[in-house]
Each structure stands twice: as structure tokens, then as C-alpha cells.
Amino acid sequence: MDRRSWPWKKKASDKSILVIDSAADASHSQIDKEAIKKPKYVQISVEQYTHFTGLEEQIKSYDVQIKGYDVQVKTYENQVESYEEQVKDFEEQIDAYDEKVHEYEEQVQKLNEDVEDLNEKLSVANEEIVTKEALVKQHSKVAEDAVSGWEKADAEALALKNTLESVTLSKLTAEDRAAHLDGALKECMRQIRNLKKDHEVKLHDVALSKTKQIEKMTMEFEKRMCDYEQELLRSAADSDALSRTLQERSNMLVKVSEEKSRADAEIETLKSNLEMCEREIKSLKYEVHVVSKELEIRNEEKNMCIRSAESANKQHLEGVKKIAKLEAECQRLRSLVRKKLPGPAALAQMKLEVENLGRDSGDARQKRSPVKVSSPCKSPGGYSSTGSEFSLDNAQKFQKENEFLTERLLAMEEETKMLKEALAKRNSELLESRNLCAQSTSKLQSLEAQLQQNNSQKSSLEVCPNLNTSNPSSSISVSEDGNDDSGSCSGSLSTNPSQQIKKEKDMAALERVESVNSHVELMDDFLEMEKLACLPNLSSSNGSIDSKDGSGDQKSEMVILDAHTDLEDSDRGSPAVMKFRSRLSKVLESVSPDADIQKIVGDIKCILQDVNACMDQEKPSEVHVHPEEVSDLCPEQNLVEDCHLAEQKLQSIHQDLKNAVSRIHDFVLLLRNEVKAGQDTSIEGNDFVELIEGFSVTFNHVLSGDKSLDDFVSNLANVFNEAMERKVSFRGLASSEVETLSPDCIDKVALPESKVVDKDSSQEIYQNGCVHNEPGVPCDENRVSGYESDSKLQEIEELRSEKEKMAVDIEGLKCQLQESEQLLADIRSQFDSAQRSNRLADTQLRCMTESYRSLESRAADLEIDVNQLKEKIQKLENELEDEKCNHQEAILRCHELEEHIQRHRNTSLVAEDDEEADIKSKQERELSAAAEKLAECQETIFVLGKQLKSFRPQPEQMRSPQTRNESYSEEEELGTTTTSVPKNYAVVDEGDSVNEVPRFMESPKCPSDSETSDTTTSPSRVGSRLSRSGSSTNATPEKASRGISRFFSSKSGY
């Protein structure tokens, strides 16, 4: 192609280079100023911000709950300390009772010593009596000797008279001594009687006071035991609630840790993707650099073509001038020839001149020919063989590169879609986990409220007098499933891009969550029923042996009805629950006052087991039991084992109580036998025996379970009160009359001078060998001695009976002390268990705090990672901005080149001919095609920039659908004009990245592409451009994918 019409291009190109350099410097200074002015912020999405705020609020709530648990633990410790102080007070009271018992034993020992002294005195008196009898015998022998030897001597008679007088004197003295001894004995007897009366009164008062104190102590012990049992039950319920909350928290922590591990894995994948993106960005940068180099080479080729065209034009002008000169000379020669013919010499000279001119022109042609051959515009088509081959190879390479880049861009778009879907799933899972946490907290609050209501109902029931009787100690142990399948909501990262499948999965996950929540609520209601059944039963288990009391039946019916109402409110949808409800209603309708509660409880257990089996069969695919959840079930199995151990303990206690009751019954039967064997005139034995027989009937009823221990104790108290009123005493196997002696008997003992004597006693006295020579005095002496011995024996027997009574009382007190010690041991064991539970709660709270700290540290690490990723993204954005700036500079240079070309066109229109006008039109077409290709290159580069931008985090707010549609319509309109109007070349604004829409909503072109560079072009030039480039307005979107290949394939035409 001939380029002779551009002789002025060289100076204009020099000027354009200077203008481009100045514009580039100005643009760099403006960009640096804008970069200095614009603050750099870290972009965080709204969902991430809300997620971080939610985590902070959860941590604060967990801190508040931990503080509440600390306060509860402190209250438990204070209660334990108060219990220990009460136990110490009980031990001090027991020590005081032991001291009193020791005092009573000392008093008994003193009384025994007094009895021994009296026995010694009686033994001395007996010895004196024996000596006196020996003397009487000797005197009788002497009298016989005197009667036999009366005839021997009168002197002996006088001597005997003297001896008789001395004997009478000794008798008088002995009688005086006996009188003195009788007075002393009377005084001793009076003192003994007074002591007996005082001791009897004191013992009676002491026994009454002790019985009253013991009754008070027993009542206080029972009340305190009931209070302690209630407090222990409350503490057990609180510990169960705490253990459940801790288990739920541990499950939540495990889930959070799993989610964090998954998030870490996702972050690692994102990091790897970012690294890949960085590599791709580097490769794209390299490709852009290569393209820029090629553009520079093409620009240099353009300049060379322009220079060659200018030189060709100059040579052409010179040739024209020479031709003109030759024509002038030819005309001159013709005129000379016409005037006159030249001679031979003139012809030879003309030949030489013509040959010289031909040589000069041939040399000039030979000089011009290599330039024309080397130029790409020599042939009429405008292409040379080497240039065409080079352009085709480059076009094929660029097409392949474009296809590879498009494939990579599509892969990157798919990966970003996958990541967005995964992030959306994560957000939904986090929302679901938060909802589950809220539901669990609400359930815990409702459980606490229900426990408080149950405690208030229990206190109100205990106030009622009809409900003070015993209840059966039955405990319903229901194995809770505990399968909190909130973790099943979290699916795998592999997602389907279609939205319908995603919606279906979300609906299935919601259905699973609802089903699992209903199942968990059902199990919680069962546990509440178990608690309600255990609380009143355990509070009254110490006062009952078997489980067939009427009031116990009423209480159990009330508890089961409350549980039934709770179950009716818990779940109303599943068929298993409806079946369970019908079965439970049948069982409750079949309950009667005479029914066995243990049987009812067994039926309820069977129903619960069937319901658990049905729930497991109905949802085998939805409820997945993981090993971690199985390990979470272990505390509930321990609770069941503890319930079984408690039942065994209660059974052993019931057996011990049965043995004690049978011993008491045997004692009362022995008392009845003694009363029947030794009935006295002062006792109405028949009524007392009938009372004992009624007591034995109640004993049989208690053993059979028809009556409770309260009736047994009341009947036993009636028997003892009757025995105390009738003054019945138990002395082993022999009854005494010490306490029922009449005043006549006391007078008989007190007055030995009375002459009313029974025949049996007189015969016993005469059997001792008394001779009735002088019947008056010896008979009276024997009678007095018999009465004294009988009275002493009776006193000894009375003292022995009193001693035995004291021993029995002491044994009873010892038994009571043993019972109190057993109660104290039980209380201590209960305190130890409470302390252990408190220690477990402390350890669990410490574990919770440590886990919270680890979570905080992990959250800090994640924040650090996020900040690092944000920094990387900012770096990538800065690099993209630099590339945009470079692109804008290239666009400005292209605009300047176009302006120069337009100027050359305007100047060349005046001087060119028709052929040159055709050439110019061709050149203008080629330039317009180049401009179109440049626009397509700009579009592809801008699309690449957008795709690089999409690797940044999502914006905080999405644009509304109206704005999206408007932007999309504007982009379509602008897309039709970018190929024709050079002012539509994209100048990307950094402010557009804030309100960026997702890639799947973007159009191939951005509204920011409509920004123009009107500062460098005038309206007339724009109009001329629009008029000339009207043929290119019908560009299709396929040019965006094949723009680079067309541009580089058409460059060879220059």
C-alpha cells in the first residue's frame, strides 16, 4: 500500500510522544494523590460482623452463667457448712446425753453400795441372833442339869438361883439391846422407804422427762431428716440439671470445635485458592506485559511504515520533478530538432546525456526497490509473504491463549460459586446452631421454673394433714436418648449449583432438626415425670415399709397425672406419641386406691421403653448416634445405676425396719404373757391384753403393707401409755409388787409387835427347833425375826427389779443412741455425696472455663488469619488498580494517536487525489477496525479485572433488583457503543468496588465503562468519529471472546 500522503508524520509523532509522556506523568501524580487521600479500610461483610458480635454476646452470656454457677456453688458450700455445724450440735447433745447416762449409772452404783451395806448389817444381826440362841441352849442345858441334880446339893440351888438372876439380868440387857436394834431397824426402814419414794418419784420424773425429750428429739430428727432429704433431692435435681447443662454445653463445644476445624479446612482451601489466584494474576500480568510489548512493537512498526511511506513520497516527488525536467528537455530538444537537425557530434552528445540520465534513474530505482520490498505495503493487497506468515502464527497462538484464559476464568467462576454456596451453608448452619442454643437455654429455663413449681407444690402438699403418711419409694429410671442431632444439619462442602436441590436439602435439614427437637423434648418430659415421681416418694421413704398406703397412692396418682399433662403439651404430632398417650391414659384409668404402685410404675417403664424403640425405628436415617454422643450417654447410665443402688439401699433399710418391728412385737408379746401369767387385783388385765392383741393385728397389717409405720407407732405408743398408767413393769420372767404395795403390807412390815400371823409362817418359825418350856417370850422373838427376814427379802427383790428396770432403760437409751449414730452416719454420707457432686460441678466448670479460653484463643487466631487474608486481598486490589492505571495510560496514548491520524487525514484530504482518497478510506477503515479491536481488548482486560476483583470478600450490602436491572440495561446499551465510540473506553473507578454485585448477576460490561475521556477530544471530532464508525455499532458479544485474536490478526495489514 502506498503511503506517499504522509510527509508530515515524523514531526507529529515526535510531538505525540512528548504529549503522551506529559499525560502519563500527570496521570501518575493524580493517582498518587488519590492513593494518599483515600484511607485504606478493612472490608468486612455484614454477616461476618453479626457473626462476630453474636460470638461476643455468647461469650458474655457464658461468663454470666459461669458467675451464676459460682454463686450456686458458694451457696451449696454454705449449706454444707451449716449442715456440718448442725451435725456438731447433735454430737454435743449426744455427748451430754452420754454424760447424763454415766451420772445415772453412778447413782445406781451408789444405790447398790447402800444395799450391800444394809446386807452386811443384816448379816451381823443374824450372827448376833445365832449367838443368843446358842446361849439360850446352854442355859436350858444348865437348867436340866440343875433339875437332875436338884437332890445333890442345896448350895448348888443357891448358886443356880444366882446364876438365874444373872441370866435374867443378861436377858433384860439383851431385850434392851433388841429394843434398841428394833428402833434402829425402824429408822433404817423409814429412811429406806423415804429413799425409795424419793427415788421412785425422781425415776418417774426422769423417765417422763427422758421419754418426752426422746420423743422431741425423734420428732426433731425426723423433721430434720425430712428437710435434709428434701434439700438433698433439690441438690440432686440441681446437680442433674447442671450435669445436663454441662453435657449440652460440652456437646455444643464439640460441635463448635468441629465447625471450627471445618472452617479451618475451608480457610486452608481458600488460601490454596488464593495462592492459585495469585499465580494466575502473575501469569496474567506477564501476559499483559507481553501484550504491551507487542503493542509497542506494532507501534514502532507503524512508525517505520509511516517513515517508509514518507521516504517513498519524497522519492516519488523527486522522480516527478526529474520527469518534468526530462519532459522539458525533451520538448526543448524536439523544438531544436524541429528547428534544425543536429549533426553527428550533437547526436553523440545527446546519446551520452540520455545514457547518463538512464543510469541515474536506474540507480535510484535500485536504491528504492529494497525499501519497497521490505515494506509490508508493496503488494496491492497490502501483505507480504513473511508478514502474513508471522501474523497467522501469532493469531493462532493468541487464539489458543484466549481459549485457555476463558477456560481458566470459567473454572475460577465455578470455584467462586462453590465457595459462595459453602459460605452460605456455613452461615445457615451457624444460624441453626444459634437457634438450637436458644432453644436449649429456653428449655433449661422452663425446667428450672417447673422444678421451682414442683418444690412449691411439694411444700403445699406437705402442709396438708392428709398427705403426711408414707409413700412408696419407687424411682422410675428412664434412659434418655440424648441424641442432639443438631450436628446432622451440617452437610458436606460438595454442593450442587442448582438452587432447587439446595432448597430441598435445606427443607430436609429443617425437618430433621424439628424431628430431633421433638424427640429431645419428649425425653425431657419423661425425665420431668421421673423427677416429679421421685421427689415426694423419696421425702417420705423413711416412714414406710411397703408401698400400699392410701395417701401414697393419691400422691403418686397426682404426680403421674402431672407428668401426663406435661407429655400432652410436649408433642402432638407423631403416631408413637399418640400411641403412648393412649396406653398411658389406659394405665391411669386403671389406677385404683387399692392398686399396687410398683406395678403401675413397671407398666409405665415398659411403655417408655416401647416408645424409645418406636422412635429409634421411625428415624433410623435421621438420628445418627456418634461415638461422642454415646460417650455423652454414660452419665445418664450412671444415673440409672445410682437409682438401682438407691433402690437396693431402700430395700435393705426396709428389711432392717421389718426386723426391728418384729423385735418390738416380740417384746410386747412377752409383756402380754407376763400380764396373763401374773395378773394382780390392781390391773385390769383383760383390757390390756385386748389392746396388745389389736397391736399384733396392726403389726400383721404393716407387714402385709395395708398400713404404714405411723399406725404401728401410734398403737405402740397407746400400749406403752396404758402400761405406764397401770404401772406395769417388766422384770425379765418374774413380776414384782414393789410399785403396787398396799399401805397394809407396809404397816405389817413396819410393826413387828402385831400378833396377826399366818399359820404357814408360824410353822416355818417353829421348825427352827424351839422348845416350849417357857412359851411366851421365845415365840415372840421368832415371829419378829421372821418378819424382818421377809421384809428384807422383799426389799432386795424390789431393789433387783429396780436395777433391772434401770438396765432396760439404759439399753433403750443405748439403742436410741445407736439409731441416732446411724442417722448421723447416713447424714454424713449424704453430705459426702453432696460434696462430691459439688466437686464434680467445680471440675466441670473449670473444664468449661478452659474450653472457653481455648475458644477465645482460636477466635483470635482466626481473626489474625482473616486479617492476613484481607491484607493479601488489598495487595491484589492495589495491583489491579496499577494495571487499570497502565490500561488508562495506554488508552490515552491510543486517543492521541487517533487524534494525530485524524489531523493527518484532515490535512491529506486537501492534497490527495481520488486514488489517495481511496487509500485514505482504506486506512480509515483499518484504523476503525483497529479501534474496535482495541475496544474489544479493553473489554476483555476489564472482564479479567472484574474476575480478579471477585476474589475479594463479598460487599456489605447487595444492590436492589431495580438497580441491578437498570445497570444491566445501561451496560447493554453501552456495550453496543464501546466498539464505535472511543470515549466509552473504560476508566475504572475505585468507588464502584464497594457496591459490587456478585459475578453471577454481572453483565459482560460494567456501567463504569461509560466514563469517557472527553478532555482530550473535541465535539467535532467525536461527531466525525461517530459518523465514521457507524458500521461497527452492530458488534456482537462474540467479539469479547475473539477480540484479542482479531486485533493481532489484523495488525499485519499495516
UniProtKB/Swiss-Prot annotation:
Which residue ranges are recorded for the region named Disordered?
Answer: 359-390, 448-506, 951-1054
Question: Any idea which UniProt keywords this protein has?
Answer: Coiled coil
Composition bias, Low complexity: 371-380, 450-461, 470-494, 1007-1032
Identify the Pfam families for this entry.
FPP
Q: State if Acetylation is listed as a keyword.
A: no
- Ranges in coiled-coil conformation: 64-139, 174-200, 250-341, 389-463, 637-666, 788-944
Q: Which InterPro entries match?
A: FPP_plant
- Say which domain of life the source belongs to: Eukaryota
Does the keyword Coiled coil belong to this entry?
Answer: yes
* Family statement drawn from the similarity comment of this UniProt entry: Belongs to the FPP family.
Query: Self-association or partners: how does it assemble?
Result: Interacts with WPP/MAF proteins.
Know the name of this protein? Filament-like plant protein 6
